Amino acid sequence: MKTRAVILAGGEGSRLVVLTAKRAKPAVPFAGKYRIIDFTLSNCVNSGIFDVMILTQYRPHSLNSHIGAGRPWDLDRGFTGGVRLYQPYKGRADTDWYVGTADAIQQNFSFLKDTNPELVLILAGDHIYEMDYDAMLSFHTDHQSDLTIATIRVAREEATRMGILATDDNYRVTQFMEKPKEPPDTLASMGIYVFSLPVLDKVLSEDAKRKDSHHDFGKDIIPHMVKTGMRVFAFPFGGYWVDVGTIDSYWRAHMDLLKHPPELDLNDRTWIIHTRSEERPPALIQPGAVARDCLISDGVIIAPGAVVERSVLSPGVYVGPQAVVRESIILTDASIEAGACVERAIIDKDVTVGHNASVGRIVPDAPDLGIATVGKSAQIPGGVVVGRGATIGLNVGPDHFSRAGVRDGTTLEREPFRAGM
């Protein structure tokens, strides 16, 4: 059946703090060479879906630049589909920014129906997973479903921040709870939905008229459909899936890539993750350098005597002589100078960690203070110590640091960033 995918890519992702201060969550780099949205886009084309809408909102500039006309994903098409990006606009009868996920679709429904799809596949642009959507579309048709929700089993401690479902023996959803304080089950919504176009039109139109609605799929649309007896089914997914919505989950997802075997195999040639790549020379690991259990991107230089272990290095990263990088994520064109030590940290683009400086630390059997993070273009002067779980904001320069450094779990910032959503 003719299917159109709609990717919701407007999320602020404020729990990623400095990583999303200047970019949308789907545009955050992942696994060295990719952006988070690459996984959803690649799932679409690998599933034979070449008609894709992307709804953006928060700081869309880097995302728009990355996707462009869609060529890396074979989505630079005209009359046969392709990718189109839509941002909030102000019309006579329209609001400004989207107030919820359902509102985002509703405001763009006139564009959505332009290509006359029979089915609409609604996706999140900020999850890491590989999935053949064709199996879910067939499940939807076979069950004559009004709505099909992709589901996965999660740990009970994660269930409180997700939509949780109960089903009967035929996968029909009998109950749906958005972020319950005491989840009765661990079957969670993945934020992936299949509707027929007429059903989607009906439920969105009805929801738009409800003054007490948040205009959100998880909070309003799905519970109402279940309550009123519509045919809502759960499609079980058994693969790897993670919402990298926090610093900890983002870091852990990278560590998952370094396991033997990895929980998500980026080398699977039957399911290629496509991306827009810069032209960079091959990585250079100089004599005397050590690199173990790492993902190393093009343009990386690891100098003599440096040690890099269980880490992910993005394009253009420099690791100087005698420097140490362990269990860390280093983003594009960051420089770890001679003798510096970076452990359990995330270093954003264009950061310099000065000679003999230290960011984060691995302390066996000590309380977990989280992952140290350093925002884009920050400059950490030589010899300064940035503690475990500390946060350095964007563009923080050498003059902002004291000799005492930055204590464990504290924040040093130049430009305030919003957090807490």
Task: Give residue spans per PLM region.
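Left-handed beta-helix
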Residues: 1-4, 198, 206-421
